[in-house]
Amino acid sequence: MQSIEDIWQETLQIVKKNMSKPSYDTWMKSTTAHSLEGNTFIISAPNNFVRDWLEKSYTQFIANILQEITGRLFDVRFIDGEQEENFEYTVIKPNPALDEDGIEIGKHMLNPRYVFDTFVIGSGNRFAHAASLAVAEAPAKAYNPLFIYGGVGLGKTHLMHAVGHYVQQHKDNAKVMYLSSEKFTNEFISSIRDNKTEEFRTKYRNVDVLLIDDIQFLAGKEGTQEEFFHTFNTLYDEQKQIIISSDRPPKEIPTLEDRLRSRFEWGLITDITPPDLETRIAILRKKAKADGLDIPNEVMLYIANQIDSNIRELEGALIRVVAYSSLVNKDITAGLAAEALKDIIPSSKSQVITISGIQEAVGEYFHVRLEDFKAKKRTKSIAFPRQIAMYLSRELTDASLPKIGDEFGGRDHTTVIHAHEKISQLLKTDQVLKNDLAEIEKNLRKAQNMF
């Protein structure tokens, strides 16, 4: 009897023999078997770009292979990470149910990619990660409820699933339930219509960990709020862990009943903010390593500078660059990345001069490594170019003094002021330095215009 994961792995082995390695690594390597819904085999892609391409180019190809392996004719459907979040993820069972043909009925398990090991920690999510790990290690004892809020694609769902996986792995027979508030609402309405409210209540009040996503969609739904209020109370009184996510803190959710709002505030409220540059680069490196991709540092720096909204778009941009490289059969460079991403990066964005771009231009001109700008080295061959880079950062960007200091290894803002004043004074009399800065700025703007 084969599980859907076994079938998908066998499918991938056949696909690999029929595709070039770059194409396979770009399109297929990061896919997973998601679930089996009736006669539809659902496959999870890492982002909507890969999903759309697979849907357009490989649907029938995959269906043929599945039929060859199983003897059954499946419909094939591809979903991406955002769509996955709208699925109900039910209790994970050690021995999953099988259908009449011996294939696992994958009733929406926790996303296998969303574990603590794959979560990249940065300044914007460090506290949320620590709180989630504490909850996973001691459900209902550390923080209950745990309320995580932040924008789309920043890692809220990843942390919730990671808690679910951890609890399942470390606590025998633990019942973990993940779903969206919209799914909760729809099931509640159906249970009333079908006279099955008791079954509905038993389902959601008989779990050890309840993970509920996008709670803001309960706003204005009085009947559903009433039901969730009692579900919350039952689980809390029985010392079961509740984790809730939202795009805003409880106090900012409109038309949310005060009694629910107060309960959400009983435990710990933590936010996740967009990743900073260093975290974005770390995310890209981890993604590249996980997918076995060899991406030059300057390309990751370019992508990280251009995509600063959320993790999903960041990883999607990387896949888009790799895919474009494969399609046009060219090496991955910063120029190729700019070409691949031109449709998703506003032209005004690509013209913005950044501190990291300045560091790169100054470093190239004076033959200084990027990491030396952030190091504590004070030799003149490094300290002087560093001061020039600080000066240009002050002149050519809108960054604050503390921000500039942070980008140069966490230096104090007074160091930035000193560097700016020193270079300003030298420019009054030093024609060579004037020429150097003019050339650096020219190179910098030329590089920006290339992208």
UniProtKB/Swiss-Prot annotation:
Gene Ontology CC terms: cytoplasm; plasma membrane
Region listing for Domain I, interacts with DnaA modulators, in residue ranges: 1-72
Keyword annotations of the record: ATP-binding, Cytoplasm, DNA replication, DNA-binding, Lipid-binding, Nucleotide-binding
Location of this chain's protein in the cell: Cytoplasm
Sites where the protein binds ATP: 153, 155-157
Superkingdom of the source species: Bacteria
Region (Domain III, AAA+ region): 109-325
Matches recorded under CDD domains: AAA, Bac_DnaA_C
Described purpose of this protein according to its UniProt entry: Plays an essential role in the initiation and regulation of chromosomal replication. ATP-DnaA binds to the origin of replication (oriC) to initiate formation of the DNA replication initiation complex once per cell cycle. Binds the DnaA box (a 9 base pair repeat at the origin) and separates the double-stranded (ds)DNA. Forms a right-handed helical filament on oriC DNA; dsDNA binds to the exterior of the filament while single-stranded (ss)DNA is stabiized in the filament's interior.
Family per similarity comment: Belongs to the DnaA family.
Name of the molecule in the record: Chromosomal replication initiator protein DnaA
